[in-house]
Amino acid sequence: MPLPRAVLFDLDDTLIRAYAQPEEAWTRLLHIFAAHLDAHDAAAIERVRVAVMEEARAFWSDAQAAAKWRLDIPTARRLSVRRGLARLGNTDEALADRIADAFTEMRRNEYRLYPDAHATVDALRKAGVKLALVTNGAAEIQRDKIARFDLGHRFDHIQIEGEFGQGKPELAVYRHALDRLEVDACDAWMVGDNYEWEVVAPQRLGMCGIWYDPFEAGVPAHATAKPTRIIKRLAELVE
């Protein structure tokens, strides 16, 4: 597959590992709070984890609410943890908030750059491909990640939901990035881990939607669009 004129990259769980596989992270954290939760064995911890994660999924399933709360993840997490504990009969909101804040801090401390991220982006740039970083989320949080992992100077255009005013999968987001790169949709790839945001929406504009699937989750059962390509490593883009 020949290289395009431009590549738009997602940030979270594409260039950096940020929020993937939350099950293991929640289990680790809930063990720390086991005594406060009166959860004294693995089965009790699992009940709390399931309740918290199911409430989080329900919380984020509302597209309009998600667009609002993506700009304030810590508060959103507090609300969903409160709901998860309340479902189990625990209405201690102060405890729920401490758990949510601890999870936010733990995830922040565990952000990692994918090992082939810099090399892949640099190889594309060296090949003359124009590059944009297009990410949802709050400006301050995303800018901190970009600086922390030395990504800023590697892109011709950086577009953050909290600064631009709209986030993926709004088509205006991709159109604006393409305009800034002065490239037509048919000459561009969108690369990322979110099926709706990096495959379905970009393909509506005529872009190639390249799905990054490092954990081999497979195409979602409900998918109505097929990825232009599936990669398990970023380096596959330039191999």
Residue ranges and their predicted role:
Residues 57-68, 107-115, 204, 208:
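Short amphipathic alpha-helical segments at helix boundaries and their inter-helical linkers
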Residues 24, 75-79, 140, 172:
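A generic alpha-helix surface/boundary motif
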Residues 1-53:
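Active-site neighborhood of HAD-like aspartate-dependent phosphohydrolases
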Residues 37, 85-91, 124-126:
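Hydrophobic alpha-helical bundle segments that form small-molecule/ligand-binding pockets
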Residues 16-20, 90, 108, 112, ...:
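Residues in soluble alpha-helical coiled-coils and helical-bundle/repeat scaffolds
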Residues 3, 70-78, 92-97, 101, ...:
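Short, acidic loop-to-helix structural element flanking the phosphoryl-transfer center
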Residues 50-102:
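A metal-dependent, Asp-based hydrolase signature
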Residues 1-7, 19-20, 35, 43, ...:
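Asp-based, Mg2+/Mn2+-dependent phosphohydrolase catalytic module
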